[in-house]
Regions:
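Cytosolic-side transmembrane-helix boundaries in multi-pass membrane proteins
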Residues: 1-59, 68, 272, 279-286, ...
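Interfacial/capping segments of alpha-helical transmembrane domains
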Residues: 65-88, 208-221
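Single transmembrane alpha-helix segments in multi-pass membrane proteins
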Residues: 69-73, 79, 87-143, 162, ...
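Hydrophobic alpha-helical segments embedded in the membrane of multi-pass proteins
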Residues: 102-111, 128, 171, 193-196, ...
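Alpha-helical transmembrane segments within multi-pass membrane transporters and channels
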Residues: 148-189, 193
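Transmembrane helix-bundle core of multi-pass membrane transporters
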Residues: 187, 191-256
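Helix-loop-helix "hairpin" substructures at the membrane interface of multi-pass membrane proteins
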Residues: 239-312
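Transmembrane alpha-helical segments in multi-pass inner-membrane proteins
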Residues: 299, 303, 307-374
């Protein structure tokens, strides 16, 4: 009986402790939730200019920390900065190299920004980029025998090839959009999976049926010489002002679509507040599919520019630059604003160009450039991803 009484008292005491601790735990959780709500409110209420200011401040801080790391590792930070500037803008070749990277970052960055701005996560831009590139090359090679050689035929083939790339990229983007809108599938998972599928299928085609006759390397046949962007201003292989002009034109068109059209309004509303959009008469599911298709089409155009301006053929995508993945950081740096993608792409293009120069002409490890880019991504992505997560999960003190 005594033991039973002691156990009963012990049980009652434990229950009292649990009841006593419960309100404190609830208070702690409540305070933490209120703190998250306040932070979410501030991020969600921030204007585009405020978000860009946060991105610029984060980038500046990341660059300063990067220079501190350079100094700690035993290198002269001022000499490092000099090498970066020289590698990015030191001469005509450096500028052309920087603008080449910038062109690709702008196009792929806009593709990411379209989806992210609408509240959906298209992580499959790299796959859509690869599909668009191969589609461009093969459509041009197949159609070339039916069109006259020369400038006129070359322009027609470029237009047809780029259009085919946009269609292929758009279809690749539409699939995860359909799965999300009508099957409630997580688009992050589906787009990542489609990246692997795209790279695998394109790699098989380049190494097999589409491999150029007599090629030792897994490449397609080269495009006809008259199917190329003209070398204007810069006489540098791998870059043409025409490619940059296409990228800037895409930025303008996307900006106008997103800010001046009903589709742009529906796109953003459906992504962030699907129930409210449906109540207002918007077919939210159809709009999500259209958004992913639009994003994929721009990624396909990026692949077309890469194939025509840089390669002149198509190779195993395993060796193709990962512009589609880097574009996620570019878009986040620009606060998912298509206009902001231009300076963000220039920053990444300049750093990539500088890394190429430093790797050849300096004893400074090129990995330091990668480290600085990583810091920029970390500092910039954290607040923007928190804002996007808050919008998607309903964080915030107000009803949204």
């Amino acid at each position: 009986m005594s033991n039973e009484g002691e156990q009963s008292e012990s049980s009652n005491s434990a229950s009292d402790d649990e009841r006593g601790a419960g309100p404190n735990d609830d208070d702690d959780r409540g305070r933490a939730r209120k703190g998250l709500d306040r932070a979410a409110d501030r991020m969600l209420d921030a204007s585009v200019l405020e978000r860009l200011a946060i991105a610029v401040a984060s980038t500046t801080l990341a660059l300063l920390i990067g220079l501190a790391i350079v100094a700690v590792t035993g290198y002269d930070p001022l000499l490092f900065v000099s090498n970066v500037i020289e590698g990015a803008f030191g001469d005509a070749n450096a500028i052309a190299r920087t603008l080449r990277f910038t062109t690709m970052f702008v196009l792929t960055g806009v593709a990411v920004a379209i989806a992210f701005r609408a509240g959906v996560f298209n992580i499959g831009v790299q796959g859509q980029f690869v599909v668009g590139g191969l589609t461009t090359v093969m459509s041009i090679l197949w159609l070339a025998p039916f069109l006259p050689e020369g400038v006129g035929g070359g322009v027609a083939l470029i237009v047809l090839g780029t259009t085919a790339a946009a269609i292929a990229g758009g279809l690749d983007g539409a699939l995860p959009g359909v799965l999300k809108a009508y099957g409630d599938a997580n688009e992050i998972i589906t787009t990542i999976m489609l990246n692997f599928i795209a790279v695998g299928v394109v790699g098989y085609l380049v190494e097999g049926p589409f491999r150029g006759e007599g090629n030792r390397a897994p490449n397609t046949e080269r495009l006809p010489e008259y199917v190329a962007f003209p070398r204007i201003v810069f006489d540098s292989s791998g870059f043409s002002v025409v490619g940059l002009a296409i990228a800037l034109a895409v930025v303008v068109v996307v900006t106008l679509v997103m800010t001046r059209t009903r589709f742009g309004y529906d796109m953003i509303t459906s992504g962030h507040q699907q129930d409210a959009a449906t109540f207002a008469g918007v077919d939210a599911r159809k709009t999500i599919v259209s958004t992913m298709t639009f994003s994929g089409a721009v990624a396909g155009i990026a692949g077309a520019v890469f194939a025509i301006m840089i390669q002149g053929y198509y190779s195993d995508p395993g060796g193709v630059a990962t512009y589609g993945f880097d574009a996620i950081a570019v878009s986040l740096l620009a606060a998912n604003n298509p206009l902001g993608v231009v300076p963000a792409g220039l920053l990444f293009g300049g750093l990539d160009s500088a890394g190429t120069h430093i790797g050849i002409y300096s004893d400074v490890p090129v990995q330091l450039i990668d480290g600085i880019l990583g810091l920029v991504v970390l500092f910039v992505a954290a607040p923007e991803l928190f804002r996007m997560a808050a919008a998607r999960t309903g964080l915030g003190g107000e009803d949204r």
